[in-house]
């Protein structure tokens, strides 16, 4: 049993000692079975939320009505959720009501995919009622039970299925795929924010190529913000190794380059996904300096976006980042005498004092002239030299 589970075992033992059932569930169990790095460890129990709160000193109520309580244990936090059954779903995204139960198999039955519906006991025994281990062996993404029922309960599950394709390198099982084609329009009931989370995870997956192609082939792409009508561009984008880029703004910038949108449309597209303003701004900066130019003035104007543009260019051309070349670009950038106007050894206030003039457009124009001369290597970035240069300029 991995260390992540060992650290959480006292919670299971504490619940069991009080007469309750308790198991590890979800993604951590899946990743353990697949010998992958384990993320958050979640626990399912027959204890009610109130009983969980009584048993543990430090808890946080994050949704008791849905059965979930956070337990703080040593330096970790664990989601402890009561076994539950769900009534009919409303709006294709949440159940009308939740009923607490005492059956683990009934609890696991309501989960989205077989690979996520496995549990593990305190002794390390795998409990797999729905063939998750078999599907992992076959590298298949399959829903628990009828796929149409699962997708009508929560339409986001269609995106989750394709996202796991990208992360795990699995294929969509035939019936699950057919249900996506049939029910894809239900995704309209899901908030943009939830779609964005899944789409960004998909782009980060090592098998995003197959996942993007599946989204196009099933028509799922048509239900995503701003992508209907861009099927061909998305097929071209599918061959790009998005997972090789570290920052989310870099992945969005790369996607924009494949879509071929003008700056105004590109910004509107990013806003449709309800991305943070900072991410939008950075992505727009990257595409504005792409393809990267390595002249001093161009590098200066590009700033930090230069490196993102260089990486995207390498990946588009060679599918890999040449770290040595990237270091050479970074070295060239570091050799710039200034990285921003603030780095000039003279300020607008200095100029006003020197000229004995009030503020006006002339200050920005003069700073721009100094900036150009410093970048071109014609003028050292020292106040004394700049003043001398300005004096000689005045005499011309």
Swiss-Prot record:
It is an enzyme of class 2 (transferase). Keywords: ATP-binding, Magnesium, Metal-binding, Nucleotide-binding, Nucleotidyltransferase, RNA repair, RNA-binding, Transferase, tRNA processing. CTP binds at residues 27, 30, 111, 154, 157, 160, 163. Its cofactor is Mg(2+). Its EC number is 2.7.7.72. It holds the Pfam family PolyA_pol_RNAbd. Signal peptide: none annotated. GO terms for molecular function: ATP binding; CCA tRNA nucleotidyltransferase activity; magnesium ion binding; tRNA binding. Gene3D superfamilies: 1.10.110.30, 1.10.246.80, 1.20.58.560, Beta Polymerase, domain 2. Mg(2+) binds at residues 40, 42. ATP binds at residues 27, 30, 111, 154, 157, 160, 163. It catalyses: a tRNA precursor + 2 CTP + ATP = a tRNA with a 3' CCA end + 3 diphosphate; a tRNA with a 3' CCA end + 2 CTP + ATP = a tRNA with a 3' CCACCA end + 3 diphosphate. InterPro entries: Bact_CCA-adding_enz_type3_sf, CCA-adding_enz_C, CCA-adding_enz_firmicutes, NT_sf, PolA_pol_head_dom, PolyA_RNA-bd. Coiled coil: none annotated. One of its GO terms (biological process) is RNA repair. A single active site specifically recognizes both ATP and CTP and is responsible for their addition. Belongs to the tRNA nucleotidyltransferase/poly(A) polymerase family. Bacterial CCA-adding enzyme type 3 subfamily. Catalyzes the addition and repair of the essential 3'-terminal CCA sequence in tRNAs without using a nucleic acid template. Adds these three nucleotides in the order of C, C, and A to the tRNA nucleotide-73, using CTP and ATP as substrates and producing inorganic pyrophosphate. tRNA 3'-terminal CCA addition is required both for tRNA processing and repair. Also involved in tRNA surveillance by mediating tandem CCA addition to generate a CCACCA at the 3' terminus of unstable tRNAs. While stable tRNAs receive only 3'-terminal CCA, unstable tRNAs are marked with CCACCA and rapidly degraded. Homodimer. This is CCA-adding enzyme. It comes from Bacillus velezensis (strain DSM 23117 / BGSC 10A6 / LMG 26770 / FZB42).
